């Protein structure tokens, strides 16, 4: 197993020095789901939520979150992102599962460090925004399965999450 990189020899937290790393094209893709009542999903799909266009606003929130990640996660480097895409896929309930929306965030940069945290932050904030905009009709919504799906670029190469 690799050593933790955010601690020095004395065990103190520090921001990793990436000055000597090559700038490469980096991609981070994260995903996560919010489960809800079928009636809540119907409101979102019909565009009749009292607070407005739920998925449109959640998309903008996810993009903003990716750009602000270094302000939220203490040891993340501020990055010049070259692309942030937020996509949603709705899924109607059946006998085996709740209605839900799956969010995917794809973040890219050309730089010395990856964009996995930016993608994960984008997904979480997009899902939180859906919750915020719909909590008046469904306080039981559950965010689940938030994870890194893929990472490409840099010295460590590619990672594709098999779970």
Curated annotation (Swiss-Prot):
Which SUPFAM superfamilies does UniProt cross-reference here? Molybdenum cofactor biosynthesis protein C, MoaC
GO MF annotations in UniProt: cyclic pyranopterin monophosphate synthase activity
Q: Which residues does the Swiss-Prot or TrEMBL record annotate as the active site?
A: 132
| UniProt-listed Enzyme Commission number(s) | 4.6.1.17
Where does this protein hold substrate?
Answer: 75-77, 117-118
Q: What class of enzyme is it?
A: lyase
State the pathway, as annotated in the record.
Cofactor biosynthesis; molybdopterin biosynthesis
Q: Which CDD domains match?
A: MoaC_PE (cd01420)
Q: Which UniProt keywords apply?
A: Lyase, Molybdenum cofactor biosynthesis
Q: Domain of life of the organism in this record?
A: Bacteria
A GO BP annotation? Mo-molybdopterin cofactor biosynthetic process
Q: So what does this thing catalyse? A: (8S)-3',8-cyclo-7,8-dihydroguanosine 5'-triphosphate = cyclic pyranopterin phosphate + diphosphate
NCBIfam families, alphabetized: moaC, PRK09364.1
Q: How does it assemble?
A: Homohexamer; trimer of dimers.
Q: Identify its protein family.
A: Belongs to the MoaC family.
Question: Could you tell me what this protein is called?
Answer: Cyclic pyranopterin monophosphate synthase
